[in-house]
Amino acid sequence: MTEQSIKKVSVVIPVYNEQQSLPELMRRTDAACAQLALDYEILLVDDGSSDDSAAMLVAAAEAPDSHIVAVLLNRNYGQHSAIMAGFSHVSGDLVITLDADLQNPPEEIPRLVETAQQGYDVVGTVRQNRQDSGFRKIASRAINHLIQRATGKAMGDYGCMLRAYRRHIVDAMLNCHERSTFIPILANTFARQATEIPVLHAEREFGDSKYSLMSLINLMYDLITCLTTTPLRLLSVIGSVIALMGFAFSLLLIALRLFLGAEWAGDGVFMLFAVLFIFIGAQFVGMGLLGEYIGRIYNDVRARPRYFIQRVVSRDADSTKDKKS
């Protein structure tokens, strides 16, 4: 691997109702970046917060000698869309993403930069000694396993957003216009060299997780339908197997009636209903998956923007011009 120079680092952090953690987040992130001996910027993207997060970001961005850029979206679009909005305004050679809840310490940023300087396109992270609930750990393992099976890329922790991307990887992602985007996976599809490093994981000190059970279920559907068309192929296989089982069962009922009498076939009427319900259930599952794919095709065909930037504030300029993508 040839070492590629990094002259400027951009840190992109999506923010949604994080007013309690913002002062500590900005202080620690700025201190970590100051250790790099490189030029840097910190882009905080307000994802339609209903608290005072947006006002706090604007005040921080307007402060003298501030490295903070506030990107304000007009409403809530979701974590990954907010990050993509931040990507559209970065100017660094290396772009680092970080969650605003401080569970992944900003102090890990210099290690990501050091690893990226070895020539890697993408530097992922694996959370050590995770401070999440048992349910979150189980759900995370299931999602990671699903992604690894679907993509064939054995990255250990896709759920950790503390990651570093070379600028050409970010530019490649910005050229993708699908509505459902999962950034770590999308980045890996363009990466020639990718690696992972272990990072610390802390308990959440402020507020609650923005991922509810329903959010995790929606994320699972997003992953299934934006990663691969394997479920569609699997439906064909399952449908064929069920059809063969139904045909074989019909032959069995005919044989029982011919050789053992009508009572043998008649006594199994409730079994027939049970099998019928199984088949109907399988059809509804298949129709649901097909509906997910068709719905995503519909959204892509409409070509509506993934986000709408209402305002960008920095020490150099304050732009109120709307930008969509």
Curated annotation (Swiss-Prot):
Keywords: Antibiotic resistance, Cell inner membrane, Cell membrane, Glycosyltransferase, Lipid A biosynthesis, Lipid biosynthesis, Lipid metabolism, Lipopolysaccharide biosynthesis, Membrane, Transferase, Transmembrane, Transmembrane helix. It is an enzyme of class 2 (transferase). Its main location: membrane. It is a multi-pass membrane protein. This is Undecaprenyl-phosphate 4-deoxy-4-formamido-L-arabinose transferase. The keyword Lipid metabolism applies. GO terms for biological process: 4-amino-4-deoxy-alpha-L-arabinopyranosyl undecaprenyl phosphate biosynthetic process; lipid A biosynthetic process; lipopolysaccharide biosynthetic process; response to antibiotic. Its EC number is 2.4.2.53. GO terms for molecular function: phosphotransferase activity, for other substituted phosphate groups; undecaprenyl-phosphate 4-deoxy-4-formamido-L-arabinose transferase activity. Gene3D superfamilies: Spore Coat Polysaccharide Biosynthesis Protein SpsA, Chain A (3.90.550.10). GO terms for cellular component: plasma membrane. Pathway: Glycolipid biosynthesis; 4-amino-4-deoxy-alpha-L-arabinose undecaprenyl phosphate biosynthesis; 4-amino-4-deoxy-alpha-L-arabinose undecaprenyl phosphate from UDP-4-deoxy-4-formamido-beta-L-arabinose and undecaprenyl phosphate: step 1/2; Bacterial outer membrane biogenesis; lipopolysaccharide biosynthesis.
